[in-house]
Amino acid sequence: MPSLPQEGVIQGPSPLDLNTELPYQSTMKRKVRKKKKKGTITANVAGTKFEIVRLVIDEMGFMKTPDEDETSNLIWCDSAVQQEKISELQNYQRINHFPGMGEICRKDFLARNMTKMIKSRPLDYTFVPRTWIFPAEYTQFQNYVKELKKKRKQKTFIVKPANGAMGHGISLIRNGDKLPSQDHLIVQEYIEKPFLMEGYKFDLRIYILVTSCDPLKIFLYHDGLVRMGTEKYIPPNESNLTQLYMHLTNYSVNKHNEHFERDETENKGSKRSIKWFTEFLQANQHDVAKFWSDISELVVKTLIVAEPHVLHAYRMCRPGQPPGSESVCFEVLGFDILLDRKLKPWLLEINRAPSFGTDQKIDYDVKRGVLLNALKLLNIRTSDKRRNLAKQKAEAQRRLYGQNSIKRLLPGSSDWEQQRHQLERRKEELKERLAQVRKQISREEHENRHMGNYRRIYPPEDKALLEKYENLLAVAFQTFLSGRAASFQRELNNPLKRMKEEDILDLLEQCEIDDEKLMGKTTKTRGPKPLCSMPESTEIMKRPKYCSSDSSYDSSSSSSESDENEKEEYQNKKREKQVTYNLKPSNHYKLIQQPSSIRRSVSCPRSISAQSPSSGDTRPFSAQQMISVSRPTSASRSHSLNRASSYMRHLPHSNDACSTNSQVSESLRQLKTKEQEDDLTSQTLFVLKDMKIRFPGKSDAESELLIEDIIDNWKYHKTKVASYWLIKLDSVKQRKVLDIVKTSIRTVLPRIWKVPDVEEVNLYRIFNRVFNRLLWSRGQGLWNCFCDSGSSWESIFNKSPEVVTPLQLQCCQRLVELCKQCLLVVYKYATDKRGSLSGIGPDWGNSRYLLPGSTQFFLRTPTYNLKYNSPGMTRSNVLFTSRYGHL
């Protein structure tokens, strides 16, 4: 009888014993497909033969995908790609070539396009040797040679194949009659007096990164290669025309010469670094700044020639892309530049697929930096793919359900409907531009942090230089795309293009006010809701789906950075939706006008002021009663609506006597108001000077000592404070830091000025402008106050026609000082709570959302006998109730 199986043992065929001594043993293994890690950036490098590209991909933490994978975040190819491939790319993908760049990378195309631009702007394009394209310009070349013979002059010409590379087929001639007329050749005048180094001729390989063509963005790498000839240079004559090692500087040619010197250092051998070359120039009393300026100008002007072709081809490949969207293309170009004996740069050629071979250590050092910094500038994030899919889904729903779309205006619509329609269109245009500006600010901040050895040369910071380049761009579009030049000119001249974020917000506010007046609603001065102090770490915001738990903060550095960018974008969207409530109130008026006036303005197609009856309510004394001021005329805004209250009107003039009496009484009333306002401003300044920021758990004296200690050791704390304020805190948290000061002021001012609403005080509106300036450019305004430009915020008053009195300016200066102290105390508290900012792990960057508790920071405000009880004490003022209980 067979025995029962033991419990838990499953009977079956006996397993094969693989540990046998048979001569053959199967070694076949099951292929296991490697899974992609969630949140990993992928790269397809099947199209490159250069190992340095793969090494940099690994160093960046990207995961290489199989050759057939076309969904990678990054695709790298050595050769140019077809336009169909670019058309098939998703928005989250990047490929390292632009369509249409061959217009300057092929020798014949470059010569043809440069010739056209030279005809239009001869004084701007003097850096290209005179060139002829054979066979089309064979006759012109022969005529030029005959003219030289008549003048008894003889020049040397260099002959190149039209689409050659690596020095193949290049020769020098002095007799132009011997050239064949039907071959496809490029003939250039030879630069006979080059700048020599140790007696050798050389050229420069400059690396250029183009990250976008719509709009154009160009970066220059501040290093490169100096490629020297391998025979001492002698001006060309009949006996040495064939000595190519003397006249050509191509590495692919000179490396075959026995005199080619390979050296591991950057200051010896036949190949050296541009970094060493600039030091050489400086040591020999040459102007290095002018050298880089000339190189930058040459590069930008050359790419301006390519821009019409590249932009047209790119838009054909990517139709329907909204302006300002991320470019799926980028390109690393190699510019070959020759210097003459006066250090003037001459453009030889441009390589769209520069060699990334690393035969020597100097190649590895330079080219690794070029690639590594370029990939960092691209800002490829793990969340790009997910956000792209979500955006596509939202766009599909919008098209399906007609969401957020403006209804068409029907024929025969009334004037009221036409005005509403124009306002809606204007608001949509402004919101789109606002989103573009915020994206651009975010990109520029990332570029400034990750530029490495690159420098942005277009668009330049110099306004005059930018205007010069834009004029050249307009000429280039007119020259190469004459049929589409008008549309490009309209884009270039769009008044919204040069506006900053705060200007667009002002225009949006204007449209909102016009809309409310058109609808017959009561217009209220709007501004951000008062926030009492710092946020709690557990109640920071309503998190989106991508931020489900705090455990996500423990991810890799690249993932954390992408999540940070994603949260920033989420906040931008949130701000955009609430744009009505985040607008800066502006009640400065210049001229007394009828409230019912309707005027054209840049802010909206038709400015409408509601015809409301005059109000009988009297308002408290403030600067607004003195004079009515409109917003200034500027390049970005030509006019703005009159926002004066309905009670300020022209008085009817029955006769000359009544008119004279009313003018005298009005002057006396304004004089009395001015004196009272100065007195109240002095009281405000006195209170502001006594205000102090208190460190949690410490006395006033101890808090002052902490601030003084930070200031005394500013060299040590400067970088840490900058990192905390500009990087670790986003714009929402920065605003909440300043709200500690702002809330205290909102509490004090009504008691001094004896008004129920602080918004009615002109000084508070000035304070609001200062707060907005301090938060300008993601907190850069406040940080400038710690630097040499500590009074840069005062420039906001230079552009305004409203006169700010010395007392008001002193109040603003004290306000800025309180904000600086507040930041230092919050920074110190965060440092003590978390430990040294420099001694913690990489996950510290995510602590930007973990700010100190809200009830621990406050301004100690002195108590004065102000004898005014606000009828509407808001919840945000609860911190100060105990201190003003006796009032």
UniProtKB/Swiss-Prot annotation:
Substituting residue 205 to E results in: Nearly abolished polyglutamylase activity
> For Mg(2+) 2, which residues are the binding ones?
349, 351
- GO molecular-function term, one example from the UniProt record: tubulin binding
Give the family from UniProt. Belongs to the tubulin--tyrosine ligase family.
Where L-glutamate binds, per the record, is at 227, 251-252, 271, 367
Main location per the UniProt record: other
Q: Which residues form the TTL domain?
A: 38-390
GO CC terms of this entry? ciliary basal body; cytosol; dendrite; microtubule; perikaryon
- Name of encoding gene: TTLL7
Summarizing the function annotation, the protein's role is: Polyglutamylase which modifies tubulin, generating polyglutamate side chains of variable lengths on the gamma-carboxyl group of specific glutamate residues within the C-terminal tail of tubulin. Mediates both ATP-dependent initiation and elongation steps of the polyglutamylation reaction. Preferentially modifies the beta-tubulin tail over an alpha-tail. Competes with monoglycylase TTLL3 for modification site on beta-tubulin substrate, thereby creating an anticorrelation between glycylation and glutamylation reactions.
Quoted from the entry, the domain comment is:
The enzyme uses its core to engage the disordered anionic tails of alpha- and beta-tubulin and the flexible c-MTBD (cationic microtubule binding domain) region to bind the microtubule and position itself for beta-tail modification. The c-MTBD region is positively charged and becomes ordered when bound to microtubules: it interacts with a negatively charged patch on alpha-tubulin. The presence of positive charges in the c-MTBD region is essential for proper binding.
What are the UniProt keywords, alphabetically? ATP-binding, Cell projection, Cilium, Cytoplasm, Cytoskeleton, Developmental protein, Differentiation, Ligase, Magnesium, Metal-binding, Microtubule, Neurogenesis, Nucleotide-binding
EC numbers: 6.3.2.-
Report the Pfam families cross-referenced here.
TTL
Its GO biological process annotations read: cell differentiation; microtubule cytoskeleton organization; nervous system development; protein polyglutamylation
Positions of the region Disordered? 1-21, 519-621, 651-676
**What is the protein named?**
Tubulin polyglutamylase TTLL7
Where in the body, by tissue, does this protein show up? Highly expressed in the nervous system including spinal cord, thalamus, hippocampus, hypothalamus and cerebellum.
Region ranges (c-MTBD region): 388-450
Assembly and interactions?
Interacts with both alpha- and beta-tubulin (via C-terminal tubulin tails).
Query: Impact of altering residue 227 to E?
Result: Nearly abolished polyglutamylase activity
The yes or no answer to whether the keyword Cytoplasm is present is yes
UniProt biased composition (Low complexity)? 548-560
Please tell me where ATP binds in this chain.
160, 166-167, 188-191, 201-203, 249-250
Q: Where in the cell is it found?
A: Cell projection, Cilium; Cytoplasm, Cytoskeleton, Cilium basal body; Cell projection, Dendrite; Perikaryon
Tell me its cofactors.
Mg(2+)
